[in-house]
């Protein structure tokens, strides 16, 4: 079935195809049908949360939380929506998504296009899904980098009562200077302030919601060690490793490989697994790792678990392989 759907979708511009898929999943979420009902439970506990299985939807697929119920019916053990910013923004000019067909990769320079945090919250409230929901937050492009904390605090305060956990995205390559927040004092200042905000919100709402940091796969070994120290020092609850890459080594010479933006999909797999392995050595079990980036098979997912990940997230591979990949991973990944 999916090969026919894929053929139709791939006749469209990548972003138009994505929007059509979201609208289709939105409709699917309102039907009585589900692809998840025959799946066995493979429960695991991470960050004090119980996941029905370790396979999650990565942020970026459903930026505005429009199709939560539809994605849930594909069999995911958890869903992460966003990245969302304090106010709506258009993102970068189109075209901004490019398929690297030969490598099953995608380059995007979306730039956090979204309808704003308030719209996302309304969509979350409408959803019937009652599983683990992560909300991924970012900064507006017009906010100076020195005022980034303001945007993250605004989003954290608004999404806190509606999320199972909150992910702080400081690793998109498509928002100017955003990745500079991953380093040294800038990272420490951000994490210190957000942990203080988390403590206040925990008291206000009578419940603790884990705080997760999403990092880039392009960090050096020294930078990974520094990030790990900051994560432990500030008692961050988990880390997502990782975001898209600026490297083109795995797709050099292929059509559209020279397009600006972050590369995801199969070509990212080895780099993200290496990041997980290095992080795992540095963290030594002090906080969990959520493996994301390039998962395209049971083997590639299991390699990330074996490298130190406790949970997995995917998105790009579904574009090439369809939703059956989710069910394969749920059935066969061993924690």
Swiss-Prot record:
One of its GO terms (biological process) is 'de novo' UMP biosynthetic process. This is Dihydroorotate dehydrogenase (quinone). Keywords: Cell membrane, Flavoprotein, FMN, Membrane, Oxidoreductase, Pyrimidine biosynthesis. Its cofactor is FMN. The keyword Cell membrane applies. The active site is at 172 (nucleophile). FMN binds at residues 59-63, 83, 136, 169, 214, 242, 265, 294, 315-316. It is found in: Cell membrane. Binds 1 FMN per subunit. It is an enzyme of class 1 (oxidoreductase). Substrate binds at residues 63, 108-112, 169, 174, 243-244. GO terms for molecular function: dihydroorotate dehydrogenase (quinone) activity. CDD domains: DHOD_2_like (cd04738). It is a peripheral membrane protein. Belongs to the dihydroorotate dehydrogenase family. Type 2 subfamily. InterPro entries: Aldolase_TIM (IPR013785), DHO_dehydrogenase (IPR050074), Dihydroorotate_DH_1_2 (IPR012135), Dihydroorotate_DH_2 (IPR005719), Dihydroorotate_DH_cat (IPR005720), Dihydroorotate_DH_CS (IPR001295). It catalyses: (S)-dihydroorotate + a quinone = orotate + a quinol. One of its GO terms (cellular component) is plasma membrane. The gene is pyrD. Pathway: Pyrimidine metabolism; UMP biosynthesis via de novo pathway; orotate from (S)-dihydroorotate (quinone route): step 1/1. The lineage of its organism: Bacteria, Pseudomonadati, Pseudomonadota, Gammaproteobacteria, Pasteurellales. Its EC number is 1.3.5.2. It comes from Glaesserella parasuis serovar 5 (strain SH0165) (Haemophilus parasuis). Monomer. Catalyzes the conversion of dihydroorotate to orotate with quinone as electron acceptor. Pfam families: DHO_dh (PF01180). Its main location: membrane.
């Amino acid at each position: 079935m999916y090969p026919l759907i894929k053929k139709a979708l791939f006749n469209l511009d990548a972003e138009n195809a994505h929007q059509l898929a979201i609208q289709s999943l939105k409709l699917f979420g309102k039907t009585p049908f589900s692809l998840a009902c025959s799946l066995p439970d493979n429960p695991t506990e991470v960050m004090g949360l119980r996941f029905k299985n370790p396979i999650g939807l990565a942020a970026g697929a459903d930026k505005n939380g429009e199709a939560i119920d539809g994605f849930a019916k594909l069999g995911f053990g958890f869903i992460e929506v966003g990245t969302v910013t304090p106010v709506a923004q258009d993102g970068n000019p189109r075209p901004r998504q490019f398929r690297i067909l030969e490598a099953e990769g995608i380059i995007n320079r979306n730039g956090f296009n979204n309808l704003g945090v308030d719209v996302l919250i309304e969509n979350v409230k409408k959803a019937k899904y009652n599983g683990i929901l992560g909300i991924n937050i970012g900064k507006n492009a017009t906010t100076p980098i020195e005022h980034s904390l303001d945007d993250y605090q605004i989003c954290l305060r608004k999404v806190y009562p509606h999320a199972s956990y909150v992910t702080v995205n400081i690793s998109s390559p498509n928002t100017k200077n955003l990745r500079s927040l991953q380093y040294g004092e800038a990272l420490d200042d951000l994490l210190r302030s957000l942990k203080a905000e988390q403590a206040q919100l925990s008291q206000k709402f009578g419940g603790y919601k884990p705080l997760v940091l999403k990092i880039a796969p392009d960090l050096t070994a020294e930078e990974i060690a520094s990030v790990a120290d900051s994560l432990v020092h500030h008692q961050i609850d988990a880390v997502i490793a990782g975001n898209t890459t600026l490297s083109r080594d795995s797709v050099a010479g292929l059509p559209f490989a020279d397009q600006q933006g972050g590369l995801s999909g199969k070509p990212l797999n080895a780099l993200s697994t290496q990041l997980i392995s290095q992080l795992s050595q540095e963290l030594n079990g002090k906080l969990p790792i959520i493996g994301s980036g390039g998962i395209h098979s049971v083997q590639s997912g299991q390699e990330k678990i074996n490298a130190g990940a406790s949970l997995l997230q995917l998105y790009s591979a579904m574009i090439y392989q369809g939703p059956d990949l989710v069910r394969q991973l749920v059935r066969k990944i061993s924690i």
